[in-house]
Amino acid sequence: MLVHPQFDPVAIHLGPLAIRWYGLMYLAGFIMFLWFGRLRIRQPHIAARGWVARDLDDMLFYGVLGVILGGRLGYVLFYKPGYYLTHPLEIFKVWEGGMAFHGGFLGVLIAMWVFAKVRRRHWMEVTDFIAPMIPCGLAAGRIGNFINGELWGRPTDLPWGMIFPQAGDNIPRHPSQLYQFAGEGVALFIILWLFSRKPRPMGAVSGVFLIGYGAFRFLAEFAREPDNFLGLLALKLSMGQWLSLPMIVIGAVMVVWAYRRGNGATAAAR
């Protein structure tokens, strides 16, 4: 039987300043975005579109705003609208936690739409470019969840079941944060990186991301404990699963549309 080590959520103390692990994981995700982004712009079919390092820096700025604002508002609207309606000032206390990937994803989409308009690029060309790097941030975020001992899984009798003292029940549970790290982080990154190494029709890489994330998240939710203030919804699916299903459908439509529209041409070749 494994027991969660209960890491100190504060990684570094600098006088009165406390730097939390979760914040460091966000930073790690942004650094990996820049690192792999620079590798990506060296790929011939990407370089042919005129992508340069400065684009990465600007996209990161827009993306950070999208992640933070969208992630917070998504949590407020998708998970606790009633609470924040009566406690509106609590919305601004982001340091106390409460971020939603699906909200952050929508925030990034809006941010990239603005970036595309400013740079006069097609919005989907931008999303195709960044899609392979997004799992880096997802992986880092799930490690942050594990370090904090939050978003634990459902009870299990499997050998790797872990007791999370924060749950307060001394029951072995799935380390679902690590499942999500492996699925929507590592596996999705490998799939997207390999898929995007060759020229693809515009929208195809974005579509594969939506399918991959939606599928990995949907499956992982079967092992993840539902939020206690929501529980399971219709058909005994969690909120995360219901939000992931449209991503899978939209992603599939995008891939089919991209290849039918492409007629052998690719976004990189246009």
UniProtKB/Swiss-Prot annotation:
Its EC number is 2.5.1.145. The chain crosses the membrane at residues 17-37, 59-79, 95-115, 129-149, 175-195, 202-222, 237-257. InterPro entries: Lgt (IPR001640). HAMAP family: Lgt. Catalyzes the transfer of the diacylglyceryl group from phosphatidylglycerol to the sulfhydryl group of the N-terminal cysteine of a prolipoprotein, the first step in the formation of mature lipoproteins. PANTHER family: PHOSPHATIDYLGLYCEROL--PROLIPOPROTEIN DIACYLGLYCERYL TRANSFERASE (PTHR30589:SF0), PROLIPOPROTEIN DIACYLGLYCERYL TRANSFERASE (PTHR30589). Belongs to the Lgt family. This is Phosphatidylglycerol--prolipoprotein diacylglyceryl transferase. It comes from Cupriavidus metallidurans (strain ATCC 43123 / DSM 2839 / NBRC 102507 / CH34).
